[in-house]
């Protein structure tokens, strides 16, 4: 414990410090003391969660600040609270993990309908205001019991699962209980949306009763933030929603809206028939349709009318005891957003063709954000201090520029805690998934190399491809029959629950003869899921996951090139792909005790340029294997004999 500063050691609950954990804590403590942002790249196994909490809590308590710990998954949120429980044994500190309303809600009227976060927020408020939620009503009916429960929740660490269990027993609303506890809780673990979506953030900060200037922000798995930020600022409108708006308008006798929806749908269908799969369109594309074809003189005024009509319909449905969803409201929101962003160079407008889950060809209008900093900078510029951490943040200068962080942001890359002898990183030449090289013979060659990896791996193997197109091509080339172990395969429309079941079954084989998990880079299994021990001895990274060069991707590159001359392709195309590949490659190595091989099956990884974007702990001992039968097997056999 002598390696930690005295303040942090008061909150560090474990008898020993992991390698480089003291450096991690010192870097964060110094940055927070100076009220700066700090970027910390550190691989799994460092104990980043407890290190960040131990470093932030002394200042938070001394200055009466809140700590918001944002992460992608519920599993990560629960982990934060588990670490707080360990701290609680030494120091009285409170914390809560909160989920979205839809995940915490007990009201059948809401949970049986799939909706986006903003729609859920609006409908929840509507249900409460009209007295249609029994779980909310019970708060008033049993105020004394509720207040006591709120006091208990706000004085100690509590996971979202624990809170839901209590509320199922007592009949109170879990979301309202967590919300009412927020002003009195020190640490809140939550999703990116609560902090970075401006609409949701405004409501959340009001409930928190704390401005951004009194918040220390911790962003975990921060390599995901740029993509999440542009997704938050983007929106879409399908032909299905326009058609449903037309039907809804007829039902509620809004003839002007019905005529508008019918005209717009017909015009878009006619234009789409002449278009390729995805095309950029001018903002005037829609505005001219509205004015010239639908006969609307003032588009903005009519879009507000659509929005207001949707609000009235939702209230009417709720009054009749029906689910208050309005397609007209959704259409109105989209049209207002289109008008708002029409002259903003940080947005593009797209028309895309796609096939629905039911296999029906359709199309949609999209408003696509190009600049993550438009979403992230308003947060980073106002918080007391921020800790941004991940295993893949380099090059840090690029990350700082893309997210709009201050130039004086502290940069810290920590050494790997993994013993070098536990890791075997290889690049196999002679194969590639480059578009022009995707031939049946190339897929057969990749399959032979994958067989070599699986056969010479003691237990479980992971295989991650750049896309479902490549994944399916490997299956067609005979991959399943070539393997001597059961194959578990991710598919495009798999739900989160289905994926969890599949991964759990795959992991069970690690104690038997082993199995193979086949998924995509950037997918559910290649990020956010740990495979310690024999759950994944080897991982094969098949190809570079470069995005398909769609008009959207090209526009992103051009936008970054204009903002950061000479870096457009790197920031908008190369970096996102290399981060996905790096995340997938790190799946087998999650603790200092793990031993694993990672094999990059694409000669492009051998270039100095691509290698420079891999994490330092992978780069250090990266070895290029010649394109010869048995070359990979020789390396794997020697490695696993040595470490197993």
Show which residues each predicted segment covers.
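A substrate-engagement module of RecA-like helicase motors
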Residues: 2-11, 16, 61-188, 196, ...
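Conserved RecA-like P-loop NTPase helicase motor core
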Residues: 429-441, 492-606
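Walker A/P-loop
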Residues: 34-52
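Conserved helicase motor "Helicase C" RecA-like lobe of SF1/SF2 P-loop NTPases
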Residues: 466-491
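Conserved interdomain hinge at the start of the Helicase C-terminal
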Residues: 378, 432-466
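Conserved pre-motif I regulatory segment
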Residues: 1-40
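Signature of the SF2 helicase/ATPase Hel1-core->accessory helical subdomain module
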Residues: 52, 58, 75-78, 82, ...
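A contiguous, basic/glycine-rich beta-loop/short-helix subdomain that forms a polymer-engagement track
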Residues: 163-185, 199-207, 308-430, 441-442, ...
């Amino acid at each position: 414990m002598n390696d930690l500063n005295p303040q942090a050691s008061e909150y560090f609950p474990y008898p020993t410090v992991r390698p480089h954990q003291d450096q991690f804590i010192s870097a964060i403590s110094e940055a927070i003391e100076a009220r700066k942002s700090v970027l910390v790249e550190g691989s799994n196994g460092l104990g980043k969660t407890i290190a960040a909490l131990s470093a932030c809590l002394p200042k938070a308590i001394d200055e009466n600040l809140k700590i918001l710990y944002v992460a992608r998954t519920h599993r990560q949120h629960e982990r934060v609270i588990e670490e707080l429980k360990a701290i609680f044994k030494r120091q009285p500190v409170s914390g809560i993990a909160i989920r979205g309303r839809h995940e915490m809600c007990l009201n059948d009227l809401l949970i049986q309908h799939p909706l986006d976060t903003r729609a859920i927020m609006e409908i929840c408020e509507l249900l409460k205001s009209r007295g249609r939620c029994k779980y909310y009503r019970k708060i008033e009916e049993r105020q004394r019991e509720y207040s006591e429960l709120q006091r208990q929740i706000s004085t100690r660490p509590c996971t979202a699962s624990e809170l839901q269990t209590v509320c199922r027993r007592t009949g109170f609303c879990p979301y309202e209980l967590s919300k009412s506890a927020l002003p009195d809780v020190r640490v809140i673990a939550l999703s990116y949306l609560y902090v970075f979506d401006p609409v949701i953030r405004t409501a959340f900060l009001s409930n928190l009763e704390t401005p951004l200037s009194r918040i220390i922000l911790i962003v975990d798995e921060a390599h995901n933030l740029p993509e999440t930020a542009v997704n938050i600022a983007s929106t879409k409108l399908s032909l299905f929603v326009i058609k449903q708006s037309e039907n809804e308008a007829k039902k509620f006798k809004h003839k002007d809206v019905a005529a508008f929806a019918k005209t717009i749908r017909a015009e878009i269908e006619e234009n789409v028939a002449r278009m390729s799969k995805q095309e950029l369109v001018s903002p005037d594309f829609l505005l001219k349709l509205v004015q010239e074809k639908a006969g609307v003189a003032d588009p903005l005024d009519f879009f507000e009318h659509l929005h207001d009509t949707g609000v009235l319909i939702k209230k009417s449905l709720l009054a009749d005891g029906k689910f208050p969803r309005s397609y007209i409201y959704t259409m109105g929101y989209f049209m207002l957003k289109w008008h708002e962003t029409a002259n903003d160079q940080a947005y593009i407008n797209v028309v895309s063709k796609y096939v629905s889950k039911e296999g029906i060809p359709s199309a949609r209008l999209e408003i696509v954000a190009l600049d993550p900093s438009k979403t992230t900078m308003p947060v980073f510029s106002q918080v007391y201090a921020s800790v941004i951490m991940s295993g893949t943040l380099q090059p840090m200068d690029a990350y700082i520029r893309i997210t709009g962080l201050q130039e004086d942001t502290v940069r810290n890359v920590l050494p790997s805690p993994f013993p070098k002898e536990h890791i075997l990183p290889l690049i196999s030449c002679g194969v590639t998934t480059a578009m022009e090289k995707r031939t049946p013979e190339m897929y057969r060659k990749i399959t032979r190399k994958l067989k070599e990896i699986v056969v010479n791996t003691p237990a479980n193997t992971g295989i991650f491809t750049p896309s479902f197109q490549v994944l399916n091509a490997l299956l067609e080339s005979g991959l399943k029959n070539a393997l001597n172990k059961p194959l578990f395969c991710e598919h495009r429309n798999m739900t989160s629950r289905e994926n969890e079941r599949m991964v759990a079954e795959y992991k069970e084989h690690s104690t038997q003869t082993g199995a193979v998990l086949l998924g995509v880079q950037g997918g559910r299994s290649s990020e956010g899921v740990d495979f310690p021990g024999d759950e994944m001895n080897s991982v094969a990274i098949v190809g570079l996951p470069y995005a398909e060069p769609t008009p959207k991707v090209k526009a992103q590159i051009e936008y970054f090139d204009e903002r950061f001359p000479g870096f457009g392709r790197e920031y908008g195309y190369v970096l996102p792909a290399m981060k996905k590949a790096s995340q997938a490659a790190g799946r087998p190595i999650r603790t200092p005790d793990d031993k694993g091989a990672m094999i990059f099956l694409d000669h492009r990884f051998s270039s100095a340029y691509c290698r420079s974007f891999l994490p330092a702990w992978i780069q250090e001992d990266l070895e290029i294997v010649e394109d010869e039968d048995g070359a990979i097997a020789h390396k794997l056999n020697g490695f696993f004999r040595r470490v197993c």
